[in-house]
């Protein structure tokens, strides 16, 4: 019985309530807390709950050219509705990317509510009320300019405001505006009558007012009145004037309600209005123009109005003491502002005008300044070598100075960029010339250059190298301008780089680079290397993102129109507020506020569901998923049948509608081509097809084809680590795509034509239901595609017609033979050409078979007709065996192509589909093919120009080979000379194989072996490279598609197949359907939220995660997420025990400067870091204080480690205990890029060392061999100069004459070739090889060097042996730690050696054992000596602290001290309460006493940097001086030493525990006892006895008595001893369990967290802290948006319960054996179990173990176990037969069998050792199978090995 499958049961039986979730008690418990609190709103939230980035309703904004309140505008548009409302007729002002003011369209408006606002006040009088998350453009104190959330703003930050604003122009009577200005300033309209008075003491103004009144109002009666005791006025009686005033609402008392009419604000008449108003109410005070008004609205209007003219005004509030009223003062300051006022508005009064001119002279630049990001300016200076003025050192620049400096700087930048582009252009051309061409033109070149012909022949044969001058002459003759290239190289080296930088990259000396560039060198190959290096450096500069960003910053400074207004006050407001916002696409800002301010708008995170947006939904959902266009060709298998199709055709097959909501479709019968781990092309199953619509796509053209896809779709490319995905938008011309040529297996050699059988069958009709295909018939079908047609007479008589040229005798004969052989009836005739019917130029062969004709008609055409342009290659052909496919192509080529088979064949066609079919068919048949201009090409030969299938991208291959460089026996660079020196972008696989044969495989390290294996796979891969030629954006507006290939993420598609990256079906499932559907439904009951589980989210691909993020943004009004984190002040510990605040760590982690932390696992890799505000997740922050005084702040759901496991802060109470790791403190991580080894100084040291060894300088040496290295370099330089003019013998003679030394011809030859040896050079090179020259002070290795150095000074010895042996004597544990440190530096030490010893100490005989190691590493030996470690007896020669330690950072000083005290310091010890002391002791001879004292003084100073006090003591013992440095004896001093420095190696762990005991002891005295004492004193009032108080506080009675007497607090006798501490408090020997003495809630805070790789923990403030709850592979945007719960595998009983429930509901008989089998194969995965059950139910109602194992392709565990037991019993043949049964009858893969064998190991009755051997053997077999070995052979070999093992 077959059951028709409905909805997948995984979805049908998904848990509906928290109680339905089985086996996850901890998670359910946590989620139920949220239900109880009802505090978590709807869904997964990607922003603060219920709050957008919004403003209050009274915020002013310029919309459509007028100033209005934002609330009023949005209420009109939305009709009071909350949420999003679309609009298309609203315009606002904002700034573009250059900081210029522009007008933008608003896409939608937004209304919401919030409980919290931030109120901001600025120096210029601005006042804003915004939500906490509203971003504002800020100029920070460090000069950085960025959008900052309001809650993060600080007083002193500067807010971006516009320098001018624009209004839509409107007409207004200028004289009426002027008259109104006068009236508002000094006029009054009577409330009851038609009287108006204008009161002003200036006669000129009164006269002007009267003139304007008479002109504007015809009924006006005007009279001037001069009063004795008050100011004169103009009296007006005019009904018209009063009606005009009444309309403006200004009749009667008007002082606090005046405003600038909007019509005037938008018109040119504004100028006249302002002049009149300022004439009346404006004045000059000190250095400013000031105007006072009682109307706040008028004051704010004036600021906006003045900005129309670029005048920046300040608004200031003042309370009038006489009437206690608030007045608003408009203040215009700064000479540039005042001058703008004068030029655009001015005064009419002479008196005010004169004062204005006077104050304009006084410049005050401090009012209009910007804080400069000096780092960006300096970066430009350093990168482009630009000279800057001293102003760069100033933090603040005035606006005018800023524009002037940056505009000048831009000119210099542009000049240098142009010069660099010219240099780049010159360096693009290689220096090397074609010596074959030189050979051909030798005679001509000799004549033109004057170089002897025989000399040129020597150059050609390589017997002599030409000098640069001669080389240039030859190159010029060949038309190659080498001189231009050399000049460019010299300019770049001197101007933009340095000889040192270039030399370092090429591993050459600075002087060598100078010689090659400046001299007449013969080393042309070296010049070519320099050219390539310089070209790389030029490109790095021109493509430097940081430089581009910095130049953009300068461009912004030079062109912006922003005034930076300093914030002076920030206040949080609580209550219920309605908030509003506008959405401006692309620029996301607009100008608004009480005074004009640049504000940010909402982003797509505040969009509602698609139905609200209608046709505009895609504006915010453009890149929902990365996809390819609908007509992209792809080869697929559907139900096992191969089909060359397009995504558009797949859409028709799988999608039911054209509805955009139907975005994905799960499939189980679809396969695509992809690549496996060995880079072999394979079929893989598709789980999901995805589609969505986009407006635009990219078209990328490459060699032989093109692909169309969205910009965020990734294409697979090759880099040095293998295959990587790169976004299409990041692809550049010249990049290499990957295609394939492979032999894909095919099985068919027969066609089933039964469906085409004629209805009326007679004896004359040949029936061919089973049509066998051999090579002949395959060729015949291929020929049909080229030359065939089909015809029918009526419905039954069909013919297959071949038309061939009458001259094509071979084809005609071959076709006739095949037709005859197959027994077909045929008919032949001649036919005319299309131009001349009479000329019978072609012959037709007609196969008379209706069945064959119907088959051809149905399969060889696209369904749109039977013309040539409709032809296709039938899908069945793609399934034929490989040899048959090749013959089909041969037939196609013979009929319609040019060229030669097995060389290059061109096949022309009018059918694009046919050409694409041909290319795909050829490629799966092992033939390279491409498409060019209406033809398909099949390619076997023709060099790189034609044949590409043997080529791979050169750059990653070269990088891989360089990693093996030291293990290659031969000149691999010569093999790849074209790629290295001529810029060839690809390399052949044959050359890779050739180089691999030269590799010494046995000497490869593990990492090198990985590279070698990768290269080996690539040398055999079926992939090859195609170069990108062109990229363009095209309009599209249609569906795009993607497929999900589980566990592979790749597929081939395109008209020429290209390897693409795919999506992930789980992410799509969550994104497209569940989130959308879930978000649209309301919560049931009174619970205000729902929860989504994002299970196994670490399996999501980056594409799927990005799509999830976008969907979350889309529904962000109903989303929330859960995280648990620490506040930013928490200090986390790095592996080398430096501290760093967690917020700083995350910044450095993002910059990839720090990647590891210390946790329970030791050193662990950080995979993710996140920051957010704890209010987002509704978790308040708590402060925990421990008995040691340690503190930490964390969210309530953050976990800390306790004796009983992890516990949330919510669960922890006072007196509970948490575990602490006593990490060192006091040394923070700081970036310090100084090098610890100065190579120049080291070289100088080596030179002096050479002299000690007997080498001599020039003047003293008799031969070249005796010379010091430095003088050998001088000889080299001179030899290179002479090499162009003289023979080797002549050079030798001249060198001997000039330098007075003997030198051999062999040495001369080596020097000419640039080869130089020397002691100093050898060890400098060794230092470089080990990478020690790159070590900086902030590198962990700097600490290792310092630690070792300290220990070696104490207990090490540099012997006087030639090989440079170092001896270190210590305990075995110490030596093991030292060896680990040495290994990290690349130094190998001997095994640990133990010896018996006997010696006398202080007159006593001592016997025992000593242990030591020795190190034979001359480079390390010399480096130690260079750093001051004496060779021989240190006690005689004395001790030194190296300069790099002395002047280093605290990190290297601490490590040096740890090493020194670890060697010679006393181990701290406590008995009961008291420590025995810490000191450093060294016995020295009298001769080195003073030097040792100096050394100890320096150590003492170093200790003082850690606030550790010490003193020095010297005493005589046995004629030696015991010099001791003693740490002062007090607990606080000891604690500082033990917690900040401690010891290296063995003494360290115990010392930390001593330190933690002291910390608890001191905290008890300083914190706990102090509090007890204060409380006891308060209560000691006679009511309670002293004994009662002592019992209450658990202290002795005498402690209370001492407090009453005022004595110092002592430690009570009942305080734990150190022995008790070790027993009761120490856990696992390294953690301390400490009591929480205080827990307090401190509200919401910004919090941080990190995710580690190996262990979910990290050390923070000493606490062992749990890391993020979400998985390690989630991208940061998801981490910051998503609630992720980690589900553990379910228990058997949990799965069984659920399966029984489902079986009962579905009417299935689930047997016990069937249940056990499902549990076994599902491995704790409920979804897998349900899927197996549903699959089994499709075959039978009775589900037993047999059917379960059959549908899951798994063997019974007892079968596998039996096979293993047979093998172990030595019954190999029986075991092998059972293996074959599993593989053949059960259809199991080798990998599945191995997995089951691995699971059965524990159940075998064999000893532990054999189990280990067996696990190792299974692992080895698995590796070999993965590498491509035959499964059956490998598994048989494994059974054979087990048979031998069993003996």
Swiss-Prot record:
Write down the superkingdom of origin: Archaea
Question: What Gene Ontology cellular-component terms does the record carry?
Answer: DNA replication factor C complex
One matching Pfam family is Intein_splicing
Recite the UniProt keywords alphabetically: ATP-binding, Autocatalytic cleavage, DNA replication, Nucleotide-binding, Protein splicing, Repeat
Location of the DOD-type homing endonuclease domain: 179-311, 780-927, 1348-1508
Q: Where is the signal peptide?
A: none
GO terms, biological process: DNA repair; DNA-templated DNA replication; intein-mediated protein splicing
Name-wise, this protein is Replication factor C small subunit
What is the organism field in this record?
Methanocaldococcus jannaschii (strain ATCC 43067 / DSM 2661 / JAL-1 / JCM 10045 / NBRC 100440)
């Amino acid at each position: 019985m077959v059951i028709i499958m409905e909805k997948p049961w995984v979805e049908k039986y998904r848990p509906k309530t928290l109680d339905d979730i089985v086996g996850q008690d901890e998670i359910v418990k946590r989620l139920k807390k949220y239900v109880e609190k009802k505090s978590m709103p709807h869904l997964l939230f990607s922003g603060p709950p219920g709050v957008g980035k919004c403003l209050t309703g009274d915020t002013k904004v310029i919309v459509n050219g007028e100033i209005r309140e934002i609330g009023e505008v949005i209420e009109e548009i939305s009709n009071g509705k909350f949420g999003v409302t679309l609009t298309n007729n609203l315009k606002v002002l904002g700034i573009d990317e250059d900081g210029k003011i522009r007008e933008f369209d608003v896409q939608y408006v937004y209304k919401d509510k919030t409980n919290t606002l931030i109120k901001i006040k600025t120096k210029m009088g601005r006042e804003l009320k915004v939500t906490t998350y509203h971003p504002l453009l800020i100029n920070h104190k460090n000069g950085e300019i960025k959008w900052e959330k309001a809650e993060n703003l600080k007083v002193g930050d500067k807010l971006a405001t516009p320098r001018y604003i624009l209004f839509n122009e409107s007409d207004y009577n200028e004289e009426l505006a002027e008259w109104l200005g006068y009236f508002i300033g000094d006029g009054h309209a009577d409330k009851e009558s038609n009287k108006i008075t204008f009161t002003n003491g200036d006669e000129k103004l009164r006269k002007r007012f009267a003139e304007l009144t008479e002109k504007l109002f015809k009924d006006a009666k005007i009279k001037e009145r001069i009063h004795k005791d008050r100011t004169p006025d103009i009296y007006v009686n005019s009904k018209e004037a009063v009606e005009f005033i009444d309309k403006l609402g200004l009749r009667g008392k008007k002082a606090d309600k005046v405003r600038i009419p909007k019509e005037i604000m938008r018109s040119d008449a504004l100028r006249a209005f302002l002049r009149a108003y300022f004439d009346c109410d404006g004045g000059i005070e000190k250095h400013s123009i000031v105007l006072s008004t009682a109307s706040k609205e008028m004051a704010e209007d004036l600021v906006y109005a003045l900005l129309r003219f670029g005048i920046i005004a300040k608004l200031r509030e003042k309370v009038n003491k006489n009437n206690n009223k608030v007045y608003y003062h408009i203040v215009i300051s700064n000479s540039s502002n005042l001058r703008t006022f004068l030029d655009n508005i001015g005064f009419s009064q002479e008196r005010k005008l004169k004062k204005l001119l006077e104050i304009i002279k006084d410049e005050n630049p401090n009012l209009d300044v910007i804080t400069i990001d000096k780092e960006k300016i300096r970066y430009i200076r350093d990168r482009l070598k630009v000279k800057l003025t001293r102003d760069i050192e100033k933090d603040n620049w005035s606006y005018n100075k800023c524009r002037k400096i940056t505009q000048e700087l831009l000119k210099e930048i542009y000049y240098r960029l142009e010069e660099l582009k010219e240099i780049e252009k010159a360096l693009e051309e290689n220096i090397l010339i074609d010596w074959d061409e030189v050979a051909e033109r030798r005679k001509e070149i000799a004549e033109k250059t004057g170089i002897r012909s025989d000399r040129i022949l020597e150059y050609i044969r390589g017997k002599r190298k030409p000098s640069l001058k001669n080389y240039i002459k030859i190159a010029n003759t060949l038309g190659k301008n080498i001189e231009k290239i050399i000049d460019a190289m010299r300019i770049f080296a001197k101007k933009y780089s340095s000889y040192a930088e270039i030399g370092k990259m090429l591993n050459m000396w600075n002087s060598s680079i100078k010689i090659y560039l400046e001299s007449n060198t013969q080393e042309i190959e070296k010049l070519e290397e320099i050219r390539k290096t310089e070209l790389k450096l030029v490109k790095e500069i021109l493509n430097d993102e940081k430089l581009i960003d910095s130049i953009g910053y300068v461009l912004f400074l030079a062109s912006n129109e922003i005034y930076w207004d300093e914030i002076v006050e920030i206040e949080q407001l609580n209550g219920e507020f309605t908030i509003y916002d506008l959405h401006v696409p692309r620029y996301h800002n607009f100008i608004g506020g009480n005074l004009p301010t640049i504000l940010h708008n909402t982003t797509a995170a505040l969009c509602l569901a698609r139905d609200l947006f209608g046709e505009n939904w895609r504006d915010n959902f453009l890149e929902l998923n990365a996809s390819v266009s609908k007509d992209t060709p792809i080869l697929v298998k559907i139900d096992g049948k191969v089909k060359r199709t397009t995504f558009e055709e797949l859409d028709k097959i799988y999608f039911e509608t054209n509805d955009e909501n139907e975005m994905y479709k799960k499939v189980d019968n679809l396969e695509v081509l992809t690549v496996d781990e060995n880079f072999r092309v394979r079929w893989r199953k598709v789980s999901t097809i995805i589609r969505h619509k986009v407006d635009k796509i990219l078209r990328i053209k490459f060699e032989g084809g093109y692909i169309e896809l969205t910009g965020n779709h990734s294409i697979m490319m090759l880099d040095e680590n293998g295959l990587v995905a790169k976004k299409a938008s990041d692809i550049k011309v010249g990049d290499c795509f990957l295609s394939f040529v492979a032999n894909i297996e095919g099985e068919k050699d027969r066609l089933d034509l039964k469906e085409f059988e004629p209805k009326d069958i007679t004896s004359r009709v040949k029936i061919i239901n089973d049509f066998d295909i051999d090579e002949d018939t395959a060729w015949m079908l291929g020929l049909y595609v080229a030359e065939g047609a089909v015809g029918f007479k009526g419905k039954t008589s069909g013919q297959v017609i071949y038309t061939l040229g009458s001259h094509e005798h071979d084809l005609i004969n071959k076709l006739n033979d095949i037709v005859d052989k197959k027994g077909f009836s045929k008919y032949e005739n001649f036919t005319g050409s299309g131009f001349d019917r009479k000329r019978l130029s072609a012959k037709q062969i007609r196969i008379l078979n209706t069945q064959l004709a119907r088959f051809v008609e149905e399969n060889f055409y696209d369904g749109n007709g039977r013309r040539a342009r409709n032809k296709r290659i039938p899908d069945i052909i793609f399934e034929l065996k490989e040899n048959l496919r090749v013959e089909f192509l041969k037939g196609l080529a013979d009929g319609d192509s040019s060229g030669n088979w097995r060389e290059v064949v061109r096949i022309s066609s009018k059918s694009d589909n046919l050409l694409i079919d041909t290319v795909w068919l050829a490629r799966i048949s092992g033939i390279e093919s491409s498409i060019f201009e209406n033809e398909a090409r099949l390619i076997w030969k023709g060099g790189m120009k034609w044949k590409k299938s043997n080529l791979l991208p050169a750059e990653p291959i070269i990088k891989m080979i360089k990693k093996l460089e030291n293990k290659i026996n031969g000149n691999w660079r010569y093999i790849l000379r074209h790629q290295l020196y001529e810029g060839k972008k690809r390399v052949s696989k044959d050359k890779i194989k050739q180089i691999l044969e030269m590799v010494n495989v046995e000497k490869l390290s593990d990492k090198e072996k990985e590279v070698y294996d990768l290269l080996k796979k690539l040398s055999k891969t079926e992939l090859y490279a195609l170069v990108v030629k062109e990229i363009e954006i095209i309009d599209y507006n249609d569906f795009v598609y993607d497929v999900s290939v589980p566990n592979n993420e790749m597929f081939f598609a395109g008209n020429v197949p290209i390897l693409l990256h795919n999506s992930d079906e789980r992410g799509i499932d969550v994104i497209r359907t569940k989130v959308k559907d879930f978000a649209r439904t309301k919560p049931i009951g009174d619970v205000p939220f729902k929860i989504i589980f994002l299970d196994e989210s670490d399996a999501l691909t980056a594409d799927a995660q990005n799509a999830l993020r976008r969907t979350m943004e889309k529904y962000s009004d109903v989303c929330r997420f859960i995280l648990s984190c620490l506040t930013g002040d928490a200090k986390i510990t790095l592996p080398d025990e430096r501290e760093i605040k967690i917020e700083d760590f995350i910044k450095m982690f993002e910059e990839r400067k720090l990647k590891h932390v210390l946790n329970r696992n030791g050193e662990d890799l950080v995979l993710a870091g996140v920051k957010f505000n704890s209010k987002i997740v509704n978790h308040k922050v708590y402060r925990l204080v421990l008995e040691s005084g340690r503190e930490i702040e964390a969210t309530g759901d953050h976990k800390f480690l306790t004796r009983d496991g992890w516990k949330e802060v919510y669960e922890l109470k006072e007196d509970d205990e948490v575990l602490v790791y006593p990490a060192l403190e006091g040394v923070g991580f700081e970036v310090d890029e100084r090098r610890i080894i100065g190579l120049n100084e080291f070289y100088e040291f080596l030179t002096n060392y050479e002299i000690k060894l007997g080498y001599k300088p020039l003047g003293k040496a008799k031969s070249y061999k005796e010379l010091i290295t430095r003088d050998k370099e001088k000889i080299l330089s001179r030899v290179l100069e002479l090499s162009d003019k003289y023979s080797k013998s002549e050079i030798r003679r001249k060198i001997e004459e000039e330098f007075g030394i003997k030198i051999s011809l062999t040495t001369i030859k080596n020097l000419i070739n640039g080869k130089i040896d020397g002691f100093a050079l050898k060890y400098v090179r060794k230092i470089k090889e080990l990478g020690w020259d790159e070590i900086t002070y902030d590198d962990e290795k700097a600490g290792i060097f310092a630690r070792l150095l300290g220990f070696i000074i104490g207990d090490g010895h540099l012997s006087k042996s030639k090989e440079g042996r170092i001896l270190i004597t210590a305990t075995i544990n110490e030596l093991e730690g030292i060896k680990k440190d040495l290994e990290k530096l690349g130094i190998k030490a001997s095994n640990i050696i133990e010896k018996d010893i006997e010696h006398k100490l202080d007159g006593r005989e001592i016997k025992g054992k000593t242990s030591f190691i020795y190190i034979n590493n001359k480079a390390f030996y010399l480096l130690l000596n260079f750093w001051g470690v004496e060779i021989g007896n240190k006690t005689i020669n004395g001790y030194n602290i190296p300069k790099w330690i002395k002047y280093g950072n605290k990190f290297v000083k601490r490590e040096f001290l740890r090493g020194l005290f670890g060697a010679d310091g006393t181990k701290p010890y406590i008995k009961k309460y008291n420590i025995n002391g810490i000191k450093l002791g060294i016995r020295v001879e009298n001769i080195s006493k003073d030097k040792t004292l100096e050394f100890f003084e320096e150590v003492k100073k170093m200790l003082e940097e850690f606030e550790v006090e010490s003193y020095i003591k010297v005493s005589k013992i046995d004629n030696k001086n015991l010099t001791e440095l003693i740490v002062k004896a007090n607990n606080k001093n000891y604690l500082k030493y033990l917690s900040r420095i401690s010891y290296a190696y063995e003494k360290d762990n115990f010392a930390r525990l001593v330190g933690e005991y002291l910390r608890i002891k001191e905290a008890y005295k300083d914190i706990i006892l102090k509090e007890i004492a204060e409380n006891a004193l308060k209560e000691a009032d006679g009511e309670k006895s002293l004994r009662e108080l002592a019992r209450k506080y658990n202290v002795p009675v005498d402690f209370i008595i001492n407090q009453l007497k005022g004595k110092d607090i002592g430690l009570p006798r009942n305080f734990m001893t150190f022995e008790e501490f070790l027993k009761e408090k120490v856990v696992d020997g390294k953690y301390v369990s400490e009591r929480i003495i205080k827990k307090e809630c401190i509200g919401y805070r910004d919090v941080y967290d990190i995710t580690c790789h190996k262990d979910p923990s990290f050390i923070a403030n000493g606490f062992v802290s749990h890391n993020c709850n979400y998985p390690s592979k989630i991208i940061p945007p998801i981490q910051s948006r998503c609630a992720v719960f980690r589900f553990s595998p379910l228990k058997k009983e949990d799965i069984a319960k659920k399966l029984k429930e489902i079986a009962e509901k579905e009417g299935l008989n689930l047997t016990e054996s069937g249940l056990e089998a499902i549990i076994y194969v599902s491995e704790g995965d409920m979804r897998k179990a349900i899927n197996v059950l549903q699959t089994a139910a499709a075959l039978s109602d009775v589900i037993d173990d047999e059917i379960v194992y059959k549908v899951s392709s798994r063997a019974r565990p007892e079968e596998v176990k039996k096979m293993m037991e047979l093998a172990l019993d030595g019954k190999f043949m029986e075991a092998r037969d059972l293996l074959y049964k599993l593989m053949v009858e059960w259809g199991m893969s080798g990998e599945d069998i191995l997995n089951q064998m691995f699971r059965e190991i524990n159940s075998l009755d064999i000893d532990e050792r054999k189990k280990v051997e067996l696990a190792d053997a299974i692992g080895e077999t698995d590796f070999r199978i993965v590498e491509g070995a035959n499964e059956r052979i490998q598994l048989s070999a494994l059974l054979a090995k087990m048979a031998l093992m069993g003996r």
